[in-house]
């Protein structure tokens, strides 16, 4: 299928339960800003607290008042808890969701200007950005980067990363280059098993965070080596085709 790709993207982790840069607030939750060069700006998830999200954004010099959309991976409080407070800043805005929330939450969000866009199947969001569609109550965000392939951002990966990666690749008929987010695994064995699958899929950048345990990260690193990057609050990752390479913020895996 035809897709409009992005020349480059910048990914910034605004909330996570692990640190990367000092002086930022931690949260058992996740929020990641994805910016296309000269193009759309989408925020995936809002963590559990708008005050922590907005505080970190201010500390990092990130303007959340001018987004092109908000992407909620699933309706767990550690991923959507900051949404009502964020809407006080953004005003009327598209909020891409896999399913509608409960009626009380829906009424509150619509009252604050949220235009809930329910994505039951794979779909284009804005130029260069797509959704896997609802995979059992959760969807993942896809960015199509020209010359590299796909960057897939996951909330908690409850549907399983094999399904998420294959759905993204099949929908856009391109390989997945990068995977960032919560992987929902804890043990060393699970990390090695996932690492083997991701190696078979040819991934070049893997950034586990949120609900990915330290033993699982070690298992991933033992299989994938330097493909696995440290992630945490304040981490910034730039993906751009330069002779087939990508520019990354690298660091040791905890």
Where do the protein language model's features map onto the residues?
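General beta-strand structural signal in soluble alpha/beta enzymes
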Residues: 11-13, 44, 97, 117-118, ...
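Active-site metal-binding motif and surrounding structural segment of the metallo-beta-lactamase
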Residues: 51-96, 169-179, 199, 204
